Amino acid sequence: MGAVAGPEIERLVQLLARLPGLGPRSARRAALHLIKKREALMMPLSSALQVALDKVQVCKTCGNIDTQNPCTVCTDPKRDPAIIVVVADVADLWALERANATQGRYHVLGATLSPLDGVGPQDLTIDALVARAHAAEVHEVILALNATVDGQTTAHYITDLLQDANVKVTRLAHGVPVGGELDYLDEGTLSAAMRQRTLF
């Protein structure tokens, strides 16, 4: 069976299919929707993508992405400079910001240690984190890393490196999510929740 659309449209579909969460069928539907909504959607999207391409950059202080450098989080005077929240990637930073979970500042590692994937300490921004943690104003480093083997390995590695820094190193609690039912949780989550129980 031959191509259904011209090469330009097929190229659009192929590019959309590279996005996370979009397979070939979803990409084709998205492309059709964009084409049908050319004025209302495709043109503003094209403009926004061009602005992002021209202006978005990585913050030299924390690793966030923004249109200014240092980013708006790092330059916000309401942020507590005594707290650094360590995350694996920008998506985690954005999740914490949506939850309004902290008024501290961030440090984006870029990933977690993963020997199986060939990701070592030299591939992450751990050296910059250690340097920031040694600043006189920093009193706490919060490890907001995923509760995976790679996340825990990274947390232990960072904790060891920060032993000589005059900072408290904490990590996010792991356990029962809000609205979670015990019967649906895995054994590891239940064990972590039981170990990290708090007074009520």
From Swiss-Prot:
InterPro entries in the record: DNA_Rcmb_RecR, Rcmb_RecR, Rcmb_RecR_Znf, TOPRIM_dom, TOPRIM_RecR
Keyword presence, Iron-sulfur: no
Pfam families: RecR_C (PF21175), RecR_HhH (PF21176), RecR_ZnF (PF02132), Toprim_4 (PF13662)
Ranges of residues in domain Toprim: 82-177
Alphabetical UniProt keywords: DNA damage, DNA recombination, DNA repair, Metal-binding, Zinc, Zinc-finger
Molecular functions (GO terms): DNA binding; zinc ion binding
Top-level taxon of the source organism: Bacteria
Single GO BP term: recombinational repair
Zinc finger (C4-type) boundaries: 59-74
Family: Belongs to the RecR family.
Function summary: May play a role in DNA repair. It seems to be involved in an RecBC-independent recombinational process of DNA repair. It may act with RecF and RecO.
Protein name: Recombination protein RecR
Organism of derivation: Bradyrhizobium diazoefficiens (strain JCM 10833 / BCRC 13528 / IAM 13628 / NBRC 14792 / USDA 110)
Gene: recR
